[in-house]
Amino acid sequence: MKKGLIFIAFSTLFFSTMEIAIKLVATEFNPMQLNFLRFLIGSIILSPLAIRHLKGSGFSLDKSKVLYFLFSGFMCVVVSMTFFQMAIVYSKASTVAILFSCNAVFVIPFAYFFLKEKLTKLSILSLASSLIGMICIVNPENLTNVTGITLSLLAAVTFALYGIIGRKGSLKFGFDGVVQSSFSFLAGSLELLLLILVTKISFVANWLQSVGLSKFSNIPVLQGISWSSVPALIYLGVFVTGLGFSFYFLAMEATSASTASLVFFIKPALAPVLALFILGEAITLNVFAGIVLILAGSCVELFSDNRQAKLEKLAQAHALAKQAVGSTNQAHFR
């Protein structure tokens, strides 16, 4: 258990500094370029752990698995993380960190509609508390950054959809989170590279500039990388994306999925504090109220998950006991 808590601590630290590290180099890299580089590096760092998980499992790539990884990678890296990168450009790192952490809350209704998972009263309470917290942070009465808020929420919603895709893939193909992430990150990085190369075609680049999408025109791949930006790039690729997810999955192995999810429940509180000290981003009263409500909602959901897991274990134990009694009665009858 102690080892699991250490893994959670490191994963929380890396994930909580993600938006801050990106903000520090936002002016040195194109958002799409940085997205491509950090997930490519992250997939390489995750690969040894994924290979270890696949040993002796009889896993083999076929057309359906390749298509699945291409789809999940596209949803995560190309769609969700592009919204995420752009959100950090247009909004404060602390705001993006808090709103993006709500992706776990958006999973609740998606799981109900797409996975037919039961929607409990506690889940509804968690969802309501987190939504009110988001409204406090957004502050509709003084909404001055519509673009940044919208991009942050789009990143959270699409990442929640990626989580649902991951669950469906796990149920269908039987691989775990580390394999899912490693292959999806690699597939998504290659897809993003292809799109980046397309933006370099002259007529495509000219059209993107003419419609006001200059950030998506002629996107660099390696250009602009300097000695001053290399440490931040290594931190984002190796530590945040690679080791952050590695420690998260190792925490799952050492504890449980619900305990490991504490990473995303602590982040909304820790990230703004780190942003205050590193970037000087002030925590206003409405943001503080939003953090408290989101943390409350997250705690309710964690309690709900633990309660549901205990009920399932009791049901399984009851079924096994009933089966054992039935077998004993049959043997006695004979």
What does each model-found stretch correspond to?
Residues E28-V79, F106-V107, T158-I165, S181-F203, ...:
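Transmembrane alpha-helices of multi-pass small-molecule transport proteins
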Residues L37, T95-C102, G166-L190, G237-F277:
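Helix-helix packing/entry segments at the starts of transmembrane helices
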Residues T17-A21, I51-T95, L99-F100, I108, ...:
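Specific transmembrane alpha-helical segments of multi-pass solute transporters/efflux pumps
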Residues M1-F36, L143-K168, L190-L194, L311-R334:
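Glycine-/small-residue-enriched transmembrane alpha-helix faces in small-molecule transporters
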Residues K3-S11, G58-F83, T147-A155, W207-L243:
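Loop-to-transmembrane-helix transition segments
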